[in-house]
Amino acid sequence: MKSIIFNEIKKILECDFALENPKDKNLAHFATPLAFSLAKELKKSPMLIASDLASKFQNHDCFESVEAVNGYLNFRISKTFLNELANQALTNPNDFTKGEKKQESFLLEYVSANPTGPLHIGHARGAVFGDTLTRLARHLGYKFNTEYYVNDAGNQIYLLGLSILLSVKESILHENVEYPEQYYKGEYIADLAKEAFEKFGKEFFSQENIPSLADWAKDKMLVLIKQNLEQAKIKIDSYVSERSYYDALNATLESLKEHKGIYEQEGKIWLASSQKGDEKDRVIIREDGRGTYLAADIVYHKDKMSRGYGKCINIWGADHHGYIPRMKAAMEFLGFDSNNLEIILAQMVSLLKDGEPYKMSKRAGNFILMSDVVNEIGSDALRYIFLSKKCDTHLEFDISDLQKEDSSNPVYYINYAHARIHQVFAKAGKKIDDVMKADLQSLNQDGVNLLFEALNLKAVLNDAFEARALQKIPDYLKNLAANFHKFYNENKVVGSANENDLLKLFSLVALSIKTAFSLMGIEAKNKMEH
């Protein structure tokens, strides 16, 4: 709606201007401070300019009123125009708020957890954010592909194999073992050890078979990770292996050398990242010739940046903050625009239950498993709470609040609005088709404001995507639900003289809730279950 109104105003003003959304919808639906920017050029006060501009909008079908207030130009949308937009939305509900196909393309890499164990709650936040960003981008018309980078090489995978070997020796073969400083523990390791022993037999468990054992376990963990994601309604397009980039390392090093991005010192090869804003240079090839994790990651990012996407987006844990300058430096040395590599950081999550820290999983050792939380509160509540705050801010929540059936549980509160609307239609014995001819002229000021809010969803979605601020969607839904409940409690619907107008208004509110929830990966309920 905002873009339509912007274009209507531009036809008359014939210049560029900012269109704002005033908080108080009783004053205006939209406003522009254009008069202030024209004051110097026209040598007039903003109040006079705004008054002159307002006179140009007399008898415009879109607007109920256009007023000059303190130098601002305030617009109120007419009921007739809002009704036209409502008819379009209700006639084609599946297309409501959808964007036209755009040329801009994105590649999102997210989750990319080491395949050494099940996903924990820290992984879940980035996973939910990435999946919602994907749904939103595709809804708005962008080409948006997703990828999971599988770290299937290096020490972490070896440690997985070693941990299983030691578990077999200790728990099954009853040998005395000495655990290294770093190893994987938890019931899932014991389960893998038992399964591996049954599959491979006693003779297999020796030092030389650790790589084979690690590969077998890594594949099992990857299946488990995909199941964890699926449980939260998350599907990633493709999984790419770190190992698949081994052969491209030398060519990447040559390219970096050509562009003076690397140098040799102390028997190692260093990335000259300090030249590009990093705090120091970074080792990418060790003295023994083995590449560091950074080396493999540079090769992978070089490939991603070469695939022709307008922008590559990564979602990383907040502990990777210091990794950003070195990766951007490498991309610049390789001839790419580092602005086309966007990093979104997912901050830490603190989980409580009845005000106390949530218990760690015995299965995972010292982590809270994503699957445990989904099993306890459901994927809808998990997704909502992870989207309720900006991704790069710390999130603390008590899962007990998400099990309550009152307004303190936002998922329940919003769903109650959606279910309430279905209940009202059932009570009236009507369907949406029965109220399509209603012209909405009888709506009072609060009703018009509620209708405007429901129809304003697309502007919220565009803002959320462009700013990567997905919390704008749950914020919008909370306000919409609160305003709906207030309006419902203050106005008689079934049996009233303007029943059809109110039912049509409510159907728009329900459509906005259902659409926004769908983009968040949440099901809008038609009936509340107790």
From Swiss-Prot:
GO terms for cellular component: cytoplasm. It comes from the Bacteria. A motif ('HIGH' region) lies at residues 113-123. Keywords: Aminoacyl-tRNA synthetase, ATP-binding, Cytoplasm, Ligase, Nucleotide-binding, Protein biosynthesis. It is an enzyme of class 6 (ligase). Gene3D superfamilies: Arginyl tRNA synthetase N-terminal domain, HUPs, Isoleucyl-tRNA Synthetase, Domain 1. It is found in: Cytoplasm. One of its GO terms (biological process) is arginyl-tRNA aminoacylation. InterPro entries: aa-tRNA-synth_I_CS, Arg-tRNA-ligase, Arg-tRNA-synth_N, Arg-tRNA-synth_N_sf, ArgRS_core, DALR_anticod-bd, Rossmann-like_a/b/a_fold, tRNAsynth_Ia_anticodon-bd. Its main location: cytoplasm. SUPFAM superfamilies: Anticodon-binding domain of a subclass of class I aminoacyl-tRNA synthetases, Arginyl-tRNA synthetase (ArgRS), N-terminal 'additional' domain, Nucleotidylyl transferase. It holds the Pfam family Arg_tRNA_synt_N. One of its GO terms (molecular function) is arginine-tRNA ligase activity. It catalyses: tRNA(Arg) + L-arginine + ATP = L-arginyl-tRNA(Arg) + AMP + diphosphate. Monomer. Belongs to the class-I aminoacyl-tRNA synthetase family. HAMAP family: Arg_tRNA_synth. This is Arginine--tRNA ligase.
